[in-house]
Amino acid sequence: MKISYNWLKNYVDFNLTPNDLGEVLTGVGLEVEDIVPFETIQGGLEGVLIGEVKECAKHPDADKLSVTKVDVGSGELLQIVCGAPNVAAGQKVVVALVGSTLYPSVGEKLAIKKAKIRGVESFGMICAEDEIGLSESHAGIMVLDASAIVGTKAADFFKVEKDYVLEIGLTPNRGDANSHIGVARDLATALNVAYKAKVNFTKPAVQSSIFNLQSSIIKVEVQDNEACPRYSAISISNVTVADSPDWLKNKLKAIGVRSVNNVVDITNFVLHEYGQPLHAFDADKIGTEKVVVKKLAQGTVFKTLDEKEVKLCKDDLMICNGDEPMCIAGVFGGLNSGVTAATKNIFLESAYFSSTSIRKTATRLNLRTDAAMHFEKGTDPNITVDALKRAALLITEICGGEVSSEIIDLYPNKIEGWRLSVSFDRMIRLAGFFIPNDTVSKILEHLEIKIEKENGDEWDLLIPAFKTDVKREADVVEEILRIYGYNSFTLPKHLKSSLPVYDKIDVQKTENTIAELLSGAGFIEVWTNSVTQSKFEEEETLRLQQVKLLNSQTTELDALRTSMLYSLLEVVAYNQNRRAIDLRLFEFGKTYHRLAEKKFSEKRKLVLLLCGKSSSDNWLTKGTAFDFYHLKSFVTNVLNSLGHYTFEKEVSELHPYNFNLIFKTEEIEVARIGSIAKSTLKKFDIKNDVFYAEINWDYLLEKSQFAKTSFVELPKFPSVSRDLAMVLNEEINFDSIEKIAITESKKLLQEISLFDLYKGDKIEKGKKSYAVNFVFQHPEKTLTDIEIEKIMNRLMSKYESDLGAVIRKN
């Protein structure tokens, strides 16, 4: 959200620098992410002066160039070569001096330098309107009125205004601050309470006798009061639609809003002032003289303001002139009802629409307008008339015309806010430090939270309707703390803490731990839809377990997922279509299974996916493509970090995997990993190899060593390392070697790793050579060579007898 520093001063009489203002707003929860200088003409016309052409002669070596002598008030005439056909002696002109920089309306910035043009030196530039960013006109140089004073700074002549724009990262729950007045309310509260500055918070005056009419030609009917709890409107006649005055254009330009015309600009101005969206209709196009707020039949076609046709659904709220739709309520206007240069009479709407209704329509139609986003965050139902009056006063002032109807205000069920009983003592305990009673009262008063009754420790509060995020006592405490200031209390010199031991695992904490582990390895967490297409599932057993939806919103998304693979493949396809090929993804989620008639189960899973390269190409080396072993190492790290050791079993032809591995403990499947079959990838139009792992998260949580926290003293005695090489049958896996080592080492084995694998001509066909490293350590003494040799001899004997290994000795 963009907030103008100068604009904010219209409501709060503060005296802060932009940086200080940013610190205050950030302190009250409106995080200022950036502060950007703004000028109504980019660059502020620094180094640009008003001059007078004293002499003008043809260039000796170019027919289309002129050599001029220009007075800019410095006491010396500047020689400037000019290519404009309309340059002449006696003109007052805009001159850019050497060293200045211009920002044209179109194109790149232009640095003015001393130049020699066809042999004639030039010391500056006589400017056209587009060259200084004033307009897009390039019909020769800009000739000023004869009254212009030579030597005047162009910035002063054109009344260039300077401002600062604060970029605020507004959180979704703060719809009340989604406007200049909303920010001003928080600012004034903080300055008055935390900074004791005694500033005034002033809203625009909207009372006027022009609103005393008692009739209206255009009538309004609201057929759905749930989707539209309040609808306010007014008619204004004999307006002149034209360009907006500079002050209005500049206000909107500062916050990144394009000027359209005076009527539309006023509605946008009030939107960003109050946070209340408005819509102006051409009243003469409302043929029935009746506006109806209702929903239309499924499949109704509507042409929007940008000349695109959309198909409506039965839940889309529309503004109609009888039966014909004119506007998608709160989202987007229609082509045939908007204000144009020919408009003379307008019907101005200011309504309160349900945020849920607007969100569904805007999302389905992919129309993310400013109005829709304000309604989605939540607007104030009790300011529709004030915003309407503000806009009407500005329209009659700027566009001419007069108010020609009463204010229509359909508000059958007034939304006054909600009542909340809180305990002052409990709030102080929750805050963690004492805040005086009168300070709390003052904060609530400035935030427009009314204290209706104080009965000792108990307070009865009336929360205003615009405070949609204040629903409980803890929310009130948050409001108090953010204004009082989290930096207003001092930390004690000593902090005491304990290291708790948990008998029961903290699921969320464990997920966060693993998420941090994977994020540190370059993975990105995704959330995918648990509703999927039943046709995706290829495994027969899982297909029989599918849970079909009875009332699916679409014909394709018709079942709950039995595997998380296919939703992740959709993510891969989406990213690859946007040239994001190299992916490391993970997701915590659930799969859903039908066990029998009316019997279902949910299974928690952690899934990992790799695609593309593990590192990008550079001048020195080519990037390495992900393979099965990359994924295996990541899965192993996850299991080990939970203190869970598994044994591997290779499995073949398990669709949709090409080559896969299952990690098992006590015959329970802990994880399965593999590469996805080309036939499956083809259905998603994925051309790169994809490696996928699915981890039984329920089982890991149940067996995780995080469940019981224990503290172990760091080892005092050194570890001992030994290497062993052996030749084995090709079908024997490393997990068999690891299992024997763990069993035979009597808890002295700390680590076992495979550091070399050989298959080739130097050993018998059907055989392979493993080189394995063992690390041993005793918790209470230093192991002797004799003890190590006993362990190694026992291991070698076991490998020979159980695995048929041939030990390779030096």
List each language-model region with its residue ranges.
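Phosphate-backbone binding interfaces of nucleic-acid-interacting proteins
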Residues: 1-214, 347, 366, 370, ...
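A carboxyl-terminal module marker
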Residues: 2, 446-449, 599, 615-810
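Glycine/proline-enriched, intrinsically flexible loops and inter-domain linkers
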Residues: 5, 23, 28, 38-40, ...
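Conserved mixed alpha/beta core segments that line enzyme active sites in large multi-domain catalysts
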Residues: 49-80, 151, 261, 267-336
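Class II aminoacyl-tRNA synthetase-like tRNA-binding/catalytic domains
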Residues: 91, 115, 292-332, 336-339, ...
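Mobile "lid/hinge" segments at catalytic clefts and subdomain interfaces of large enzymes
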Residues: 118-133, 140-143, 154-164, 317-416, ...
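Terminal amphipathic helices with adjacent charged low-complexity linkers/tails
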Residues: 187, 191-208, 216-222, 399-427, ...
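Extended, well-folded interaction surfaces typified by the phenylalanyl-tRNA synthetase beta subunit core
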Residues: 420-424, 428-581, 722, 775-777, ...
